[in-house]
Amino acid sequence: MTDTTELQTGITRDIYGMPAFISLEVDDVRAAARWFVEALDFIELFAMPPGDEPVLIHLRRWRYQDILLRQGAAADVGTGVQLSLAATYDELDGLAARARSFDGTVVGGPADTPWNTRDLTVVSPQGLRLVFTARRPEPLRDAAFTADMNRWSQEQLPS
């Protein structure tokens, strides 16, 4: 699992080539941005044009966790599509509580997974499924699964 220490050292306002990002078409860009900022700790990096009626807002949580909200007819996100975001174990309960306080938000978890993570699933009012996933601390990990992963990694990944 990715070491999140470097990624979470403060939200950067750098403009960089994003290796991957998701665009979400929404009917109210400003309202959607407000939800991401207030419910899930994203920042509004910039809006085009600035002001109350932007057609695009660039959101960011940690480095490389970027979302573009674009003005358009609200579209069906699609069955089986989700955005997974690295998180820290200690922040999941707070994110869940904050997200639950917003109408139109569906929250599942946080819950432990068989693969040694703790996941929080949040479905935005726009229908985007976000999964915040954090590595479980050492004493809470399944030792048998860790041993399997180490063995499988040695068998399948070049050294």
Model-derived features with residue positions:
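Conserved beta-strand in the GNAT
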Residues: 67-70, 131
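A short acidic/small-residue loop/turn micro-motif
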Residues: 75, 114-115, 135-139
